[in-house]
């Protein structure tokens, strides 16, 4: 088992993981992004799936995408998750659902179980992200 000191030494010089937060509700997106930054993550915020795809097709190294399922525009969170699985399978996906049925269906598109059901605790999301990153191959 690695000590905290060993783990810190390995991460010296490496950028923190980047989380893409996709949420149309500005205050929710800001609060969640601030919390994740306090936890040590780089955070990129977008308000819809189109903006999220622009980020993921740019030079931004996204590790985890967190998205609401219900969003405005032509693509919802399910569509975004399907796009990520097809075009960017290196990016892990976490979805957030306000309806239990949607949360279960989202489990097929998320690597770590069903979607987080609203209202969720920010700490629950951070644990899910940490778990996904621990299981993922390390990026260079």
Residue ranges and their predicted role:
Residues 68-69:
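Active-site residues of response regulator receiver
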Residues 48, 75-80:
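Acidic catalytic/metal-coordinating carboxylates
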Residues 65, 115-116:
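Two-component signal transduction core modules
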Residues 45-64, 105:
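Acidic, metal-coordinating helix/loop segments flanking the phosphotransfer/catalytic sites
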Residues 1-20, 26-27, 33, 50-51, ...:
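Non-catalytic signal-transmission and effector/linker regions of two-component phosphorelay proteins
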């Amino acid at each position: 088992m690695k000590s905290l000191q060993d783990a810190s030494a390995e991460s010296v010089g490496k950028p923190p993981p980047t989380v893409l937060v996709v949420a149309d509700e500005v205050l929710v997106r800001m609060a969640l992004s601030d919390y994740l930054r306090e936890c040590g993550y780089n955070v990129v915020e977008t308000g819809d799936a189109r903006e999220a795809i622009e980020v993921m097709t740019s030079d931004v190294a996204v590790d985890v995408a967190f998205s609401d399922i219900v969003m405005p525009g032509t693509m919802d969170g399910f569509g975004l998750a399907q796009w990520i699985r097809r075009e960017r399978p290196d990016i892990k996906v976490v979805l957030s659902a306000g309806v239990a049925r949607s949360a279960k269906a989202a489990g097929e598109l998320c690597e770590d179980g069903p979607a987080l059901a609203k209202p969720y605790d920010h700490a629950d999301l951070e644990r899910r992200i940490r778990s996904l990153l621990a299981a993922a191959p390390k990026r260079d």
